């Protein structure tokens, strides 16, 4: 029968490798297109990650995401997402590795949280943008899409510039909304840099040079949130590239 949700395989289990792993959730997502997502409990120490990735490489697996969830004196927990043609064989080899103590198969972050809208700036404006973004994301998520909304209230040119540049390092971040009354200087330069890397940037209509550097300028914060979600939703017929004007 199917394994209970959240089940793990303890290292050395006599059962067939993979038989007690959490199934890859597939509602709205084809298993053939979804990465194999695993939480590995390993021993701690130098060379552990090298050993794990070596096993994956031996199966021609392509690691699309990796993070260290927990690192203790004795035990480390790794989260990996891997594209592989033979998940069963890979799991079998991980099962017999002397560095792996337990394996849990989970749903990928892309499947659970999907694309991310990042909102930053002044708290009052961020809150209003979030209302629009969350309301619009709800419409698309009901139809099977996955869009999540992240917010951080920040003030100051340097903190905001650092945060803008960091967005491109966030997994699955697709659009950034800058919400405030005045932004320019180093923030403008950061906006131009992340846009060059493919990130969509929407700015509220504010003082400073950031609006001029952004893809889109929206006066109403709620509408800005709505348009941010529409810009990345696959279930919406909306494209910033097709707009005849940049300011709304």
Predicted regions mapped to residue ranges:
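Compositionally biased, low-complexity flexible segments
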Residues: 1-20
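Conserved mixed alpha/beta catalytic, RNA-binding, or beta-rich assembly cores of soluble enzyme
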Residues: 106-239, 243
């Amino acid at each position: 029968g199917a394994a209970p949700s959240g089940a793990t395989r303890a290292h050395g289990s006599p059962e067939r490798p993979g038989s007690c792993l959490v199934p890859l959730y597939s509602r709205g997502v084809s298993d053939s297109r979804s990465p194999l997502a695993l939480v590995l409990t390993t021993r701690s120490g130098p060379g552990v990650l090298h050993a794990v990735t070596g096993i994956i490489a031996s199966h021609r697996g392509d690691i699309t995401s990796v993070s260290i969830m927990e690192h203790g004196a004795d035990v480390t927990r790794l989260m990996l997402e891997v594209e592989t043609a033979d998940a069963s064989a890979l799991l079998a080899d991980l099962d017999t590795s002397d560095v792996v103590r337990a394996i849990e198969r989970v749903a990928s972050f892309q499947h659970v949280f999907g694309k991310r809208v990042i909102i930053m700036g002044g708290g009052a404006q961020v809150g209003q943008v979030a209302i629009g973004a969350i309301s619009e994301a709800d419409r698309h998520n009901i139809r099977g899409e996955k869009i999540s909304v992240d917010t951080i209230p920040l003030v100051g040119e340097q903190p905001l510039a650092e945060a803008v540049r960091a967005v491109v390092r966030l997994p699955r971040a697709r659009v950034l909304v800058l919400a405030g009354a005045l932004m320019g200087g180093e923030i403008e330069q950061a906006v131009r840099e992340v846009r060059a890397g493919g990130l969509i940037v929407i700015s509220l209509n504010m003082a400073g040079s950031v609006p001029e550097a952004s893809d889109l300028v929206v006066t109403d914060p709620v509408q800005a949130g709505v348009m941010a979600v529409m810009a990345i939703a696959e279930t919406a017929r909306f494209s910033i590239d097709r707009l005849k004007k940049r300011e709304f």
